[in-house]
C-alpha cells in the first residue's frame, strides 16, 4: 500500500511521517502515485548551510563530505542539528499513472516541499560543488509523493534564479495575507492609522520578497532591518523599504529601538527572516500590542518565542511560516519580475555565491 504522504518510504522509526523519520527509503522505483525527479541542483536552507559552514570553519571539502554523509545515511537531506533541509530543481523522469501532481516526463520543475521529507540519492558525489554556497549542482534522483508540491520552472528566468526565489516563496505569500488582513480590519473599524511592517533580515531572499509583498498588500510604512552597513546600502539602493535600520537582531533592546525609531511606533507586523538563533525576544519587543510576529527562520525556538512573549506581557499573535500558502510560487515569481529591487538583490547574491 502506498501512502499519499509517503509513509511507505519511512524506514525508521516506524509510524512517523517522512519529515520526522530518521531514515527514508530512496529506492528509485516509484509507486503508481509517485514521481521520480532527476535532480540537477539542491538549495540548502540558510540556517542549515550556516551551521555546516561554521562547524567546519568554512572548509568546503568538509561541508561537502558531511552533506554527502547525511544524504547517504538518512536517504534525505536533513541537517541533524538544525532539522532543516532546503529544496531542489530537476527534470521529471517518470510520473506514476495515479500521481495527482499533473507532471509529465521531461518537465523541468522546482520541488516546493522540503528536502527533509523527500527521498533523495546523490550519484555524482557532489563533484561539481565546492561546499561554499547554498546552491549545490549535482546529479541524482528524488521521489515526490501524491501530497508533494512542485512547480514547472518558468521559461523566462534562469533556473538558478528561480530556485533561489522558490526556496523562500512561502514568506512573501504569508506576509501579504497577514498585512492585507490588518489593512482590511482597520478599514472596517474606521481606524485611519497606516499598518506598519518591520522585516528583520530585509536584504536577504525571504526578507526582500516580504518587504515587496507587504508594500503591495497595503502597508503604510515599512522598515527593513539589517546587521551590517553593506546590506543597509544594498537595501536602501533597492528601494524596497521606506526606511532601513542597522541593528543586531539578537539584541532585543537594540532591535526594538531601531524599529520604533524608524517607524515612529512599534510594528503592527514583524517578519523574522534571519538565519541565526536568538532573535525571538527582539522581534516580540518590536511589535505593538495586538500585532503579529511571523517567524520564517529555521533557527527559531518555539520555547524562546512563547516564553519571551509571556515574560514581556506582550499581547501579540505569533505565526510559524510553514512554507506553503496557496499561490505562493506564482506570487514570488511575479514580485521578482515586477520589482527591480528584488531582482537586483537576488542576482547580486547569486553572483557572490
Where do the protein language model's features map onto the residues?
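Glycine-rich beta-strand-centered segment in the early N-terminal region that forms part
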Residues: 28-43, 55-115
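NAD(P)H dinucleotide-binding glycine-rich loop of Rossmann-like/cofactor-binding domains
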Residues: 86, 109-186
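Glycine-rich NAD(P) Rossmann-fold beta1-alpha1 loop
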Residues: 169, 201-208, 212
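Conserved class I S-adenosyl-L-methionine
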Residues: 194-201
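Residues in the short beta-alpha loop(s) of Rossmann-like NAD(P)-binding domains
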Residues: 203, 227-230, 299, 324
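Adenosine-nucleotide cofactor-binding segment
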Residues: 215-277
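C-terminal capping/lid region of NAD(P)-dependent oxidoreductase domains
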Residues: 264, 334-353
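Glycine-rich phosphate-binding loop and adjacent beta-alpha segment
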Residues: 274-339
